[in-house]
Regions:
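Conserved alpha-helix/loop element of class I SAM-dependent methyltransferases that forms part
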Residues: 1-15
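Class I SAM-dependent methyltransferase "Motif I" SAM/SAH-binding loop
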Residues: 22-24
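S-adenosyl-L-methionine-dependent methyltransferase catalytic module, highlighting the catalytic core
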Residues: 93-101, 105-159
Length: 160
Protein backbone atom coordinates (compact mmCIF):
# COMPACT_ATOMS: atom_id res chain seq x y z
CA UNK A 1 0.00 0.00 0.00
CA UNK A 2 1.22 3.52 -0.76
CA UNK A 3 2.73 5.36 2.21
CA UNK A 4 0.09 8.11 2.23
CA UNK A 5 -2.70 5.52 2.28
CA UNK A 6 -1.10 3.73 5.23
CA UNK A 7 -1.18 6.98 7.18
CA UNK A 8 -4.73 7.84 6.12
CA UNK A 9 -6.12 4.44 7.11
CA UNK A 10 -5.13 5.17 10.71
CA UNK A 11 -7.01 8.50 10.70
CA UNK A 12 -10.36 7.05 9.63
CA UNK A 13 -12.48 5.75 12.52
CA UNK A 14 -13.99 2.27 12.34
CA UNK A 15 -17.53 2.18 11.01
CA UNK A 16 -17.21 5.51 9.20
CA UNK A 17 -19.02 6.39 6.00
CA UNK A 18 -16.30 7.39 3.50
CA UNK A 19 -16.25 9.02 0.07
CA UNK A 20 -12.95 8.50 -1.79
CA UNK A 21 -12.50 10.98 -4.64
CA UNK A 22 -10.26 9.65 -7.38
CA UNK A 23 -10.23 6.27 -5.66
CA UNK A 24 -8.01 4.58 -8.25
CA UNK A 25 -8.25 0.80 -8.04
CA UNK A 26 -10.07 0.95 -4.69
CA UNK A 27 -7.08 -0.06 -2.57
CA UNK A 28 -7.90 2.27 0.34
CA UNK A 29 -11.64 1.57 0.42
CA UNK A 30 -11.04 -2.16 0.16
CA UNK A 31 -8.65 -2.11 3.12
CA UNK A 32 -10.97 0.10 5.18
CA UNK A 33 -13.95 -2.15 4.44
CA UNK A 34 -12.05 -5.31 5.39
CA UNK A 35 -10.28 -3.98 8.49
CA UNK A 36 -12.44 -1.14 9.84
CA UNK A 37 -15.94 -2.01 8.63
CA UNK A 38 -16.11 1.28 6.72
CA UNK A 39 -18.85 1.82 4.14
CA UNK A 40 -18.94 4.29 1.31
CA UNK A 41 -18.20 5.04 -2.29
CA UNK A 42 -15.30 5.70 -4.58
CA UNK A 43 -15.47 8.15 -7.47
CA UNK A 44 -13.25 7.40 -10.43
CA UNK A 45 -13.16 8.18 -14.14
CA UNK A 46 -10.61 5.65 -15.43
CA UNK A 47 -12.38 2.56 -16.86
CA UNK A 48 -9.57 0.17 -15.86
CA UNK A 49 -9.60 1.42 -12.26
CA UNK A 50 -13.40 1.20 -12.18
CA UNK A 51 -13.21 -2.44 -13.31
CA UNK A 52 -10.68 -3.19 -10.55
CA UNK A 53 -12.97 -1.57 -7.96
CA UNK A 54 -15.92 -3.64 -9.14
CA UNK A 55 -13.79 -6.81 -8.98
CA UNK A 56 -12.95 -5.95 -5.34
CA UNK A 57 -16.60 -5.35 -4.49
CA UNK A 58 -16.10 -1.60 -4.01
CA UNK A 59 -19.06 0.72 -4.57
CA UNK A 60 -17.68 2.90 -7.35
CA UNK A 61 -19.28 5.64 -9.41
CA UNK A 62 -17.87 6.83 -12.72
CA UNK A 63 -17.74 10.58 -12.26
CA UNK A 64 -15.73 13.59 -13.36
CA UNK A 65 -14.69 15.44 -10.19
CA UNK A 66 -14.76 18.75 -12.06
CA UNK A 67 -18.53 18.36 -12.34
CA UNK A 68 -18.83 18.60 -8.55
CA UNK A 69 -20.52 16.40 -5.99
CA UNK A 70 -24.11 17.54 -6.53
CA UNK A 71 -25.32 13.94 -6.45
CA UNK A 72 -24.49 13.77 -2.72
CA UNK A 73 -26.41 15.48 0.08
CA UNK A 74 -24.68 17.81 2.51
CA UNK A 75 -22.99 16.04 5.45
CA UNK A 76 -23.66 12.60 3.96
CA UNK A 77 -20.17 11.26 4.78
CA UNK A 78 -18.06 11.16 7.91
CA UNK A 79 -14.84 11.45 5.90
CA UNK A 80 -14.10 12.57 2.34
CA UNK A 81 -10.68 11.49 1.06
CA UNK A 82 -8.81 12.78 -1.98
CA UNK A 83 -5.37 11.27 -2.46
CA UNK A 84 -3.07 12.37 -5.24
CA UNK A 85 -5.93 13.85 -7.29
CA UNK A 86 -6.23 17.52 -6.29
CA UNK A 87 -3.54 18.50 -8.78
CA UNK A 88 -5.49 16.78 -11.58
CA UNK A 89 -8.81 18.64 -11.29
CA UNK A 90 -9.39 21.86 -13.20
CA UNK A 91 -10.94 23.74 -10.28
CA UNK A 92 -9.35 22.64 -6.99
CA UNK A 93 -11.12 25.41 -5.07
CA UNK A 94 -14.54 24.18 -6.17
CA UNK A 95 -13.87 20.56 -5.27
CA UNK A 96 -12.59 21.66 -1.84
CA UNK A 97 -15.86 23.51 -1.24
CA UNK A 98 -17.81 20.42 -2.31
CA UNK A 99 -15.74 18.14 -0.07
CA UNK A 100 -16.44 20.39 2.90
CA UNK A 101 -20.14 20.38 2.05
CA UNK A 102 -20.62 16.59 1.81
CA UNK A 103 -18.21 15.49 4.54
CA UNK A 104 -17.64 16.22 8.21
CA UNK A 105 -13.88 15.69 7.81
CA UNK A 106 -11.67 15.94 4.72
CA UNK A 107 -8.30 14.30 4.12
CA UNK A 108 -6.24 15.43 1.13
CA UNK A 109 -2.83 14.39 -0.16
CA UNK A 110 -1.02 15.80 -3.16
CA UNK A 111 2.49 15.83 -4.62
CA UNK A 112 4.46 18.68 -3.07
CA UNK A 113 6.20 20.14 -6.10
CA UNK A 114 8.11 22.46 -3.76
CA UNK A 115 9.83 19.56 -1.99
CA UNK A 116 13.61 19.86 -2.10
CA UNK A 117 13.95 16.67 -4.15
CA UNK A 118 11.68 18.05 -6.87
CA UNK A 119 13.56 21.35 -6.88
CA UNK A 120 16.92 19.54 -6.87
CA UNK A 121 15.90 17.33 -9.78
CA UNK A 122 14.74 20.37 -11.76
CA UNK A 123 17.86 22.38 -10.89
CA UNK A 124 20.38 19.64 -11.67
CA UNK A 125 18.71 17.94 -14.64
CA UNK A 126 16.83 20.87 -16.12
CA UNK A 127 13.70 18.73 -16.40
CA UNK A 128 10.48 18.19 -14.52
CA UNK A 129 10.97 15.36 -12.01
CA UNK A 130 10.08 11.78 -12.89
CA UNK A 131 10.18 9.20 -10.09
CA UNK A 132 8.24 6.30 -8.60
CA UNK A 133 6.03 8.86 -6.86
CA UNK A 134 5.79 11.19 -9.89
CA UNK A 135 5.91 8.65 -12.72
CA UNK A 136 4.74 10.89 -15.57
CA UNK A 137 6.67 13.01 -18.02
CA UNK A 138 5.56 16.64 -18.19
CA UNK A 139 3.81 16.12 -21.54
CA UNK A 140 1.97 12.95 -20.54
CA UNK A 141 0.52 13.67 -17.11
CA UNK A 142 -2.82 14.27 -15.49
CA UNK A 143 -1.13 16.78 -13.17
CA UNK A 144 -2.30 20.21 -14.32
CA UNK A 145 -1.70 22.17 -11.09
CA UNK A 146 1.72 22.11 -9.47
CA UNK A 147 1.36 23.27 -5.89
CA UNK A 148 3.38 23.33 -2.69
CA UNK A 149 2.33 23.03 0.95
CA UNK A 150 2.30 26.83 1.16
CA UNK A 151 -0.04 27.01 -1.85
CA UNK A 152 -2.34 24.42 -0.30
CA UNK A 153 -2.44 26.22 3.04
CA UNK A 154 -3.41 29.41 1.22
CA UNK A 155 -6.29 27.80 -0.66
CA UNK A 156 -7.32 25.97 2.51
CA UNK A 157 -7.55 29.22 4.49
CA UNK A 158 -9.66 30.75 1.73
CA UNK A 159 -12.14 27.86 1.69
CA UNK A 160 -12.56 26.81 5.30
Amino acid sequence: MRADLEIIQDWIPAGSRVLDLGCGDGELLSWLRDHKQVTGYGLENDPDNIAQCVAKGINVIEQDLDKGLGNFASNSFDVVVMTQALQAVHYPDRILDEMLRVGRQCIITFPNFGHWRCRWYLATKGRMPVSDFLPYTWYNTSNIHFCTFEDFEEIGRAHV
